[in-house]
Regions:
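Cytosolic, long alpha-helical scaffolding segments
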Residues: 1-238
């Protein structure tokens, strides 16, 4: 009876961790979309809400870490049970960093002064954001469902995000060289594109955490990367 009670208590602890991660993930997804939307529409109020929303992300991460450590101390789990708890902490850490990146984009809204808004660049940024947001949702669904094939599909998809980011950098550099008045807007857009690309990297981290949680080992294959977003590599003609 004692063993059964302990098992039920552990399952309850684990379910609560999973619920908290899902709640955190939902907030992060919204932050990504809102931060880019605020930037594109020059919506200062929305940008401020994104910045303010990061505090809740941080709070949830702290709760997840505290509950995870307490569960390990009380239940002394082993093997897959221990990996489940460690994975919850790792996913929460990546989500917190994604929240920081979205917050950074939200802060940039107030700095935009130019009315320069080339439609091609805006569409590229929106497409990149849609792709990354979809990957975040997919990898969190894979984490909750213990769906390894779905997690690996996200892991393999990071290269597409990198390719879009590199293309955007080249376009932005071209606009800056054509007219110095475009520089301020383009620089902010560059940082935002890079932040979205980094969000993709954190999403890939979560996919690797799912692999570790299920398989009990790290992925040995080299992570697919197509990022060439340095100023030198992104110059037209390179």
């Amino acid at each position: 009876m004692g063993t059964e009670h302990t098992a039920k208590a552990f399952d309850s602890d684990l379910q609560e961790l999973t619920r908290l991660v899902a709640e955190m993930g939902g907030l992060v997804e919204r932050m990504i979309v809102d931060s880019v939307d605020a930037l594109i529409r020059r919506d200062l109020a929305l940008g401020k809400r994104v910045v303010a929303g990061d505090a809740e992300i941080d709070r949830l991460q702290h709760i997840i870490e505290e509950r995870a450590v307490l569960t390990i101390a009380r239940r002394q789990p082993m093997a897959i049970d221990l990996r489940e708890i460690v994975s919850a902490m790792r996913v929460a850490t990546d989500l917190e960093r994604i929240g920081d990146l979205a917050k950074n984009m939200g802060k940039r809204v107030a700095a935009l002064e130019s009315d320069f808004q080339p439609l091609k660049l805006i569409r590229g940024l929106e497409h990149m954001t849609d792709l990354v947001t979809s990957q975040v949702k997919s990898v969190l669904d894979a984490y909750a469902a213990h769906d390894l094939p779905a997690a690996m599909a996200v892991w393999k998809g990071d290269e597409e995000v990198d390719a879009i980011c590199t293309s955007l950098f080249r376009e932005l550099l071209t606009y800056m060289m054509e007219d110095p008045r475009n520089i301020s807007f383009c620089i902010h857009l560059m940082f935002c594109a890079k932040n979205i690309e980094r969000i993709g990297d954190h999403t890939t981290n979560i996919a690797e955490t799912v692999f570790y949680m299920i398989e009990g080992q790290q992925i040995l294959d080299k992570r697919p990367k197509g990022d060439m977003t340095t100023f030198a590599n992104a110059l037209p003609g390179n």
